[in-house]
Amino acid sequence: MNTFSILTAQIGMFVIYMLAGVILIRTRVMNRENLEVISKFVIKLALPVMIFINTVNGVERKTLFHSLSIFLIAGIMYICLFLLSYISGIFFHLHGNHRQLYSAMSVFGNVGFMGIPIVTSIYPENGMLYICVFTIIDQLMLWTAGVRLTSGTDSQKNRFDFRKLINPVTVSILLAVICVLTGIRLPDVLNNSLQKIGQTATPLAMIYLGGVFACIDVLKNIQRLDYYGIVILKMLLFPLFFYVLLGYLPVSSEIRTTMALTSAMPVMSSVVMMANAYGSDGDYAMGGILVTTICSVFTLPFIYWIFHFIG
């Protein structure tokens, strides 16, 4: 099976997971309250465990230091995406909570739930290493700048609070880095158990999204033009620009493709969870996730095909 077929197979699995969520809601096996329980499980346990165990098992101290170029690449990516989100927000005349959420949606992609399975299926030997190193920066950015952008514009809520940085995800990153640097290895029973828990993150996150999609006004959301600004800029034009740019840097073709694909991911599902938790407009964020996730079924294979065409 070639890499393009592997990519489309992974996306097909995502679609099936989301359809399962839709069916569960439509048949009333689950309701919106049940979905919130799933979201809490994913964001407070499954996702942190997945990040921790994948980093501990996929990154070694030597390779961590040799992969520092990914930190630089991630920094360049975020700077460019923040600038694009600012310009795009002005173009669509967005204000207040929507302006902040639009920036968050334009910057943070669904790397954890979609990027990891896609990249590791394409590059089974080194893909996890690349994603794990990137995830350190990605999650730190999400839980610093992301928390600020997904907080309500009310001055009290929008004020920076150091305590918001202390959460299951940042703790899992810190513990993982300590394990990598010290060479600590987990007992097999604990390692295998955590792997099983972490493996539930992607299916449950996609089922959650499908269920929420079944609860919202799809027609209303797909008519908002500003969401398609994210699709065009973040998911199509920027990944192509980024792929060409990385071609001029001394990085391997695998890192080049991995980072460009990472930048093309749809809106991170954690954005809507954080928007609801921090008093912003979760429905607006969910609309962005709906549109970009549906479009990603077509944009990700297209982008990957263009990468191969460019060479």
Residue ranges and their predicted role:
Residues 1-311:
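Alpha-helical transmembrane segments of multi-pass small-molecule/ion transporters
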